[in-house]
Every structure is written in structure tokens, then in C-alpha cells.
Amino acid sequence: MGVKEIVSNRKAFHHYEVLETLDAGIVLTGTEIKSLRDHGGNLGDAYVTISKGEAWLLQSSIALYRFGNINNHEERRKRKLLLHKYEIHKLDARISQKGLTVVPLSFFFSKGFVKVRIGCCRGKKAHDKRQSIIEREKNRELAAAMKRSYR
């Protein structure tokens, strides 16, 4: 079985420069898994924090399961990330550096389990955002020119 992406945080790639990525497991309830299978998640303003030696995903939204009953999950709650101790220490050291933060980049299925791809990021300034847009446009024009030349 391959990797199937469920939800991606496109806003993170626009607002942050991703320096390093890491895949982590996540503790979810049954209705959260079912809701994610229906692509019912949002990572727009989510972030990762470390407290008491554990990594937590905050402000992530997983939509309520439409067939759920009274035992349905809370839409926005703290969700524990499953990482090795050395990975947590490494993330904690990165977070303590000025200007760095850890944000979730995507939810994906790997071998039937939901995983979270998190990234150590540095915030982009306005001119950096414009520069990345200009580079993206140049690459798009170059690809279009190459495609026309092969016809």
C-alpha cells in the first residue's frame, strides 16, 4: 500500500519556508478516522507544541462525522503526536530558536494508519512571498515553452 494524501496545508507553504520535514503518527478516535476518509479536515491555522516531553497538535480541525451519534468527537481538540524521544527533543530545540515554528503540512494514510507530516518552518517576509511567486511563474512559463517546442 502506498501513501495517500488526505489534507494538505497549502497556506503553510505560502506563509513559511519549510526547512525540515518529519512524519509522525497521531492519536485519533474512530469518528475522526472516518471523517478524514471523507476528506473532512483543515490544517489552516494549526501548529505543534511540546509540553511535558510530548508533542501536541493544536488548532487542527477535523469535521464532525456525518453519521456520528452522541459519541462524535470534538472538532477542534488537542491531538497527541506519536514521535520518538530524540525526535521530540530535536523539535523542542528547533522551537526554542528564534523565528522557527513547527506546523503540520499534511495528513496522509500510510499502510492504513493516519500520519501527519510536520515541518520546521521560518516565516516568510512579504518580499520573500513575492519572490517565490515570481519564481513559480517563471517555471510555469518555461514548462509551457518546453511543451510547445516538443509539438
Swiss-Prot record:
Disulfide cysteine pairs (residue numbers): none
Cell compartment(s), UniProt: Cytoplasm
PROSITE patterns on file: SSRP
Any one annotated GO CC term: cytosol
Record CDD domains: SmpB
GO molecular function terms listed in the Swiss-Prot or TrEMBL record: RNA binding
Keywords annotated in UniProt: Cytoplasm, RNA-binding
Domain of life, source organism: Bacteria
GO BP annotations listed: trans-translation
InterPro entries, sorted: SmpB (IPR023620), SsrA-bd_prot (IPR000037), SsrA-bd_prot_CS (IPR020081)
Pfam family membership, one: SmpB
Role: Required for rescue of stalled ribosomes mediated by trans-translation. Binds to transfer-messenger RNA (tmRNA), required for stable association of tmRNA with ribosomes. tmRNA and SmpB together mimic tRNA shape, replacing the anticodon stem-loop with SmpB. tmRNA is encoded by the ssrA gene; the 2 termini fold to resemble tRNA(Ala) and it encodes a 'tag peptide', a short internal open reading frame. During trans-translation Ala-aminoacylated tmRNA acts like a tRNA, entering the A-site of stalled ribosomes, displacing the stalled mRNA.
Family of this protein: Belongs to the SmpB family.
Name of the molecule in the record: SsrA-binding protein
Organism per entry: Chlamydia trachomatis serovar D (strain ATCC VR-885 / DSM 19411 / UW-3/Cx)
